[in-house]
Amino acid sequence: RLLELFELDELEDRDNVTMREDELEEVLKGMLDYAYEKGILKENSVVYRDLFDTKIMGLLMPRPSEVIRHFHELYEQVSPEAATDYYYKLSRDSDYIRRYRICKDMKWVAPTKYGDLDITINLSKPEKDPKAIAAAKLAKQSGYPKCLLCRENEGYAGRVNHPARQNHRIIPVTINGSQWGFQYSPYVYYNEHCIVFNSQHVPMKIEHATFCKLFDFVKQFPH
């Protein structure tokens, strides 16, 4: 499938291939540069490169059903923490969480009279270039996915005004008798920053059931 993506019929010079371990960022950079040189990647800006490298990683990802099955196997046979550790590592190794950008974030603790205050400045979200901004303005408005969090994002190819998510996997969970989705945030405002979202698009509100759901989630994932 990678050959198809890069419009190749076969591997060239297979006998002289050497194996080495490089950081994922460098590997993807080389692939993106090649794609641009060959005219496969039409624009060499961060928005279009992000769309394309997510497509690359999506080809290497296990199917959603495989991820869910392995998560539940670890949860039941080992521990809830083992399950979330596996899922978090997958989210990082798949480049869904871009570690090389997250490390640019600024974080510090400021003492106040009310106690220590954790402060984070997120620098990992890429800035859109002028061409991408212009393309986003001209792009047909779409209501799909309905938001940046809903389950329809899983596997979505993305566009100039919506991030690609082919490398994204969601874990279904039942909370307080209703269906929810568990995922990690790609921007990691704090360690293992996770998100739990309703399977249905309903208004967000704080009520008695909200606290029942919170306690049910903590009961399932006590670590």
Task: Name each model feature, range by range.
Residues 1-206:
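Active-site microenvironments that recognize anionic phosphate/pyrophosphate groups
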